[in-house]
Every structure is written in structure tokens, then in C-alpha cells.
Amino acid sequence: MRKSKTKISLNSIPGGELFDRVIEDEFVLTEKACICFMKQILEGVSFMHTKNILHLDLKPENILCLTKSGNRIKIIDFGLARVHEPHKKLQVLFGTPEFVAPEVVNFEPISFATDMWAVGVITYVL
């Protein structure tokens, strides 16, 4: 019988939070950069959803830039994430208020659309 092992992998990501990047005085957020960020965010969320994972705390503070000057990003902080099982009703009452979907506020069943609400807010913020 094999023992299961838990492994933790830590990466250094020196670019900082996407939120901090876009509010820097010297950073000019162009339409092209915004499209680049959103494309990666959508690809990341799509990948999570194919694995039936709901992030439930998507916000610019949970998106890190890989470098100080580049546009590559990583989605972080899966502390509130849940496995989505379509046949089971899942309700939550947590998240960052500015980014939570109406179904969270109303304590109604959540789904992939809950994360997509936050993606829409991120798009608006950018």
C-alpha cells in the first residue's frame, strides 16, 4: 500500500499584484495590455472550471504579475476555492464584497457563473 504525500511548491513571483501594477503612477494601462491580462485571466478561469474548481475570490489582488515589467500573470489564493459538483447545491457567504456575485450575497446556489461575475468586475476595474 502506497502512502500519499502532500507537497507544497512555492515560486518567487517578483512582479507584485496586478492591482498594484495598474495603479502605479508610471504604469500606463493600454488597451493592448488590458486585453493581454484579461485573456490570461479567462484562460486560467477556464482551466479551473474544466477541473470543476470554483475560485470564489477572484480580484486584482489575487492576480500576480510574473515580472515587474512584463504582462504575464498567475492567479493565486485558492483559500476559498471549492469543488463544484453540479448535482449538489453549494452556497457560500464569503468573498471580497466588491467582487462577489449576487448569488453569494443572497446565499443562493453558486456555479461557474459566480467566478465569471468577478471576472466581469475585474474587466471593469481594468
What are the functions of these language-model segments?
Residues 49-66:
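Catalytic-loop of the protein kinase fold
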Residues 3-17, 21:
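Conserved short submotifs of the Hanks-type protein kinase catalytic core
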Residues 107-112:
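Activation segment
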Residues 37-38:
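Activation segment signature within eukaryotic-like protein kinase domains
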